From Swiss-Prot:
A GO molecular function held by the record: ferric iron binding
UniProt protein name: Antigen TyF1
Taxonomy of the source species: Bacteria, Pseudomonadati, Spirochaetota, Spirochaetia, Spirochaetales
Family, as annotated: Belongs to the Dps family.
InterPro entries noted in UniProt: DPS_DNA-bd, DPS_DNA-bd_CS, Ferritin-like, Ferritin-like_SF, Ferritin_DPS_dom
Amino acid sequence: MNMCTDGKKYHSTATSAAVGASAPGVPDARAIAAICEQLRRHVADLGVLYIKLHNYHWHIYGIEFKQVHELLEEYYVSVTEAFDTIAERLLQLGAQAPASMAEYLALSGIAEETEKEITIVSALARVKRDFEYLSTRFSQTQVLAAESGDAVTDGIITDILRTLGKAIWMLGATLKA
């Protein structure tokens, strides 16, 4: 058994005569611990963003309300999928996912939104900023996963980055008008 940085034990399929070494394609314990720590932060970021997107979905106002209301729903559905996938990856690695608002707020780099009357332009700009933050953070984790030989985490994050990249581009084009 090895330990993730959250103190939780996980079973490693790697066997090696050398301490700290792992089988080809299987990350070592230190790499797994670092990946787990990043994934825990991603779960927290996505948890906070999920609530934030609902706030915008419910409280935006402006001329394009219906279209943006539906777009925000698409975003929180997408965030839900990423949130669940990352949490399940943590479990596969033997770690526990944060699962409370207190944990999310303590770990997340995304700030809560408390404003209740939000213009469409303001909401979309804030969503774009949060997506850019996520893209940067996920890119860092992807490098760590790739360098560690964790192809599963690398693949999961590649899919998330693809979705984020398209959303950032589309939000940028929308806000340019």
